[in-house]
Amino acid sequence: MGRAFEYRRAAKEKRWDKMSKVFPKLAKAITLAAKDGGGDPDTNAKLRTAILNAKAQNMPKDNIDAAIKRASSKEGNLSETTYEGKANFGVLIIMECMTDNPTRTVANLKSYFNKTQGASIVPNGSLEFMFNRKSVFECLKNEVENLKLSLEDLEFALIDYGLEELEEVGDKIIIRGDYNSFKLLNEGFESLKLPILKASLQRIATTPIELNDEQMELTEKLLDKIEDDDDVVALYTNIE
């Protein structure tokens, strides 16, 4: 996804924050991580990352603690599911969900697509090969400087931990690696004592497409409906 789409997503995330829409999504990630690996972030890297991402969005500590406790209750009966869809203008969509009711989730997603002319849900696996899965970490540039490291030093230090690409974006450093290197890269940051601002597993289109303003406006109507669904925790497209 290109910068135009990322700017739109950034604006959307700000609206989520104002409406407290983002907190339920973050809470689900915390609950599922705690359910899978236990409620101690010191021994559960997945939970540690989920908490890190929640703190990056200013999620209150009480909300985080409640989400961890929820893992041992009936409310913690969550599962991860992925759905794929197509829209007009060659747009491909992958939706990652966390839900306690997959039947409800797929019914809601189908309704968004059915109400959008030319859009449809497709069988899982139809589009996955058109996206590469990557580990993506963000840290602050000044945190790197505080460790007396240059960007070259950082790149060299993390290569053995699976780094494939390092990019400077404003006051942040973006680190990308293979999907399977997520745990290893996390260990690399810990070995350097470099604080992670945000960490995620992302899907990046192998052949991105460009849309004009009119096409983007029409496509956004569907994407906004998907993003606003509490069960959808990540949305990926092939839009440049």
Swiss-Prot record:
User: A Pfam family in this protein?
Assistant: TACO1_YebC_N
What name is this protein filed under?
Answer: Probable transcriptional regulatory protein Hac_0344
Q: Where in the cell is it found?
A: Cytoplasm
Tell me which family the UniProt entry assigns to this protein: Belongs to the TACO1 family.
List the InterPro entries hit by this protein, alphabetically: Integrase-like_N (IPR017856), TACO1_YebC-like_2nd/3rd_dom (IPR048300), TACO1_YebC_N (IPR049083), Transcrip_reg_TACO1-like (IPR002876), Transcrip_reg_TACO1-like_dom3 (IPR026564), YebC-like (IPR029072)
Q: Which UniProt keywords are present, listed alphabetically?
A: Cytoplasm, DNA-binding, Transcription, Transcription regulation
One annotated GO molecular function:
DNA binding
- Which Gene Ontology CC terms are recorded? cytosol
Q: Does this entry carry the keyword GTP-binding? A: no
- HAMAP family, sorted: Transcrip_reg_TACO1
Report the record's Gene Ontology biological process terms: regulation of DNA-templated transcription
